[in-house]
């Protein structure tokens, strides 16, 4: 995993660990979800009727009884783990997160203390320990977070949410690499994502646009979708996503 990409993963984890902006419990799904497994499937084979033999890769996410994301993993088509993150919570505050890939630990972040609107962490990567600070500010439904490493600002994120708590826009800036991304989300009346616009800017200022449309096909008795198809900006199918959802009893 590239260093900047890994820092972004850590950044997302740190933001979710803070007390300012919180992702919705259970990933915004209905009910007390314990685990979700997503199967990403090639649409051509799926639509042809050959279901079950066409998985490209899989994602799995587990939640504790309070809805905190305690584990997530990316797997290949037969379920072998390629990368994973494990989070530990105390009183709904993330105190430790470990990132692994290829069977080895890439880094671990440990919560040290809170100083006003700053969260202080130690990042351990191999024999190197880096002091990371997350500074949070908020106004109405806008949440801003900045991550610094040993005093140098690395990443910045701005999230705008709707009245239900879902992110309608997300801006991420890699301050060292001079790259950024802007994401605009549209939700239906049941708060399911139906359109996503992403503009990415590289260090030269060149922009690329990605548009994703989502069509939902099946839902379970809790009202959570279990099958969906995504389309690109040309309205061509990209993948089918099938979800298996397990609930706490």
What are these regions (language model features)?
Residues 17-249:
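Buried hydrophobic residues that stabilize the cores of well-folded domains
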């Amino acid at each position: 995993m590239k260093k900047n990409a890994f820092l972004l993963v850590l950044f997302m984890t740190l933001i979710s660990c803070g007390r300012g902006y919180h992702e919705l419990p259970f990933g915004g799904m209905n009910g007390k979800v314990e685990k979700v497994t997503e199967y990403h499937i090639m649409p051509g084979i799926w639509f042809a009727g050959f279901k079950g033999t066409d998985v490209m890769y899989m994602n799995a996410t587990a939640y504790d009884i309070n809805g905190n994301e305690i584990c997530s993993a990316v797997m290949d088509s037969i379920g072998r783990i390629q990368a994973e993150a494990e989070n530990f919570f105390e009183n709904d505050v993330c105190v430790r997160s470990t990132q692994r890939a290829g069977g080895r630990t890439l880094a671990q972040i440990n919560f040290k203390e809170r100083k006003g609107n700053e969260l202080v962490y130690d990042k351990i990567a191999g024999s190197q320990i880096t002091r990371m600070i997350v500074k949070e500010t908020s106004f109405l439904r806008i949440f801003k977070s900045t991550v610094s490493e040993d005093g140098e600002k690395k990443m910045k994120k701005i999230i705008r949410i709707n009245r239900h708590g879902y992110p309608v826009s997300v801006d991420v800036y890699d301050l060292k690499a001079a790259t950024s991304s802007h994401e605009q989300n549209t939700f239906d009346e049941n708060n399911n994502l139906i359109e996503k616009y992403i503009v990415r800017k590289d260090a030269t200022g060149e922009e690329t646009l990605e548009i994703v449309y989502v069509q939902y096909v099946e839902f379970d008795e809790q009202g959570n979708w279990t099958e969906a198809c995504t389309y690109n900006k040309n309205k061509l199918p990209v993948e089918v996503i099938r979800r298996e959802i397990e609930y706490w009893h």
